[in-house]
């Protein structure tokens, strides 16, 4: 079974992940991992920490001679900012501490302090921080290299930021991937891009933050990934859980799910067609590539709805956890909009979910064994 564990604090020495369950002999290019880490750091609205960190991954185990070994693969990303936090983040007993007791509305400060009985909110901030998304991006970049063997491609773009909303005007966004990557907000439409950047700038000038919506598209996933047999094996449920675990994501949509809630069934469902060349297919994709928790061969479309970042330069009112007096929430260094960055992280999250279920179906200890199982299944589909 493909799984991972990650560890590390935002201002600690670094971030670590151990990935278990990858087959052996997958070609692994560290430059592709670092490229995704660089993409995560970009985007209009990012904070000053991106000027400090130059994220590069180190592979500590599980890869030799450019290929996976089939054993646990360990990744590490150094936090360059740690040198500025050595006294605060020391593992030894601190002689003097500046205790943080003013929780931010919308963040994990209050609930984390109460759940784990912390007197200092710093102990919560360090793990709830979106700095964790760096290692999740690296994990995603690893499994993307596995999926690419089977021509599975992943793309993300931003649909809205604040009041600036974009409706895609092309059918195949993969043809415009380079233009999306070149956009500071990952938006293909230059006019809407300017509006999005204007929204972010206005929020920054008033000490506020902004959320938005991004879409991830996964192409060439074969029919049959996921299962309707049990609730926890449904592919859309697995994808939704993955995205909901990403910091600040408050809603997830598969295909045209929200729009479909107000339509007749005859207007929403995708008619099934067949041809010798394509096999079974659909001309429309309102289901978002998943039916009954199982991939149907069309592009998988999933959207993440991101709330505004809770850290505000003009903070909201809160309660001092020591005195119970009304105070202003703490100000922690932060982005004021991270929707473009979240879209990149979401690619990796979706990649991991797809890879996990892909290996569940085509399991093997080596990539060659997985390919054999995959080819037999694809031949079976062609015979139907």
From Swiss-Prot:
InterPro entries: Chorismate_synth, Chorismate_synth_AroC_sf, Chorismate_synthase_CS. GO terms for molecular function: chorismate synthase activity; FMN binding. GO terms for biological process: amino acid biosynthetic process; aromatic amino acid family biosynthetic process; chorismate biosynthetic process. Reduced FMN (FMNH(2)). This is Chorismate synthase. Keywords: Amino-acid biosynthesis, Aromatic amino acid biosynthesis, FAD, Flavoprotein, FMN, Lyase, NADP. NADP(+) binds at residues 40, 46. GO terms for cellular component: cytosol. Homotetramer. Its cofactor is FMNH2. It catalyses: 5-O-(1-carboxyvinyl)-3-phosphoshikimate = chorismate + phosphate. Pfam families: Chorismate_synt. NCBIfam families: aroC (TIGR00033), PRK05382.1 (NF003793). Pathway: Metabolic intermediate biosynthesis; chorismate biosynthesis; chorismate from D-erythrose 4-phosphate and phosphoenolpyruvate: step 7/7. This reaction introduces a second double bond into the aromatic ring system. Belongs to the chorismate synthase family. Its EC number is 4.2.3.5. It comes from Alkaliphilus oremlandii (strain OhILAs) (Clostridium oremlandii (strain OhILAs)). FMN binds at residues 127-129, 247-248, 292, 307-311, 333. It comes from the Bacteria.
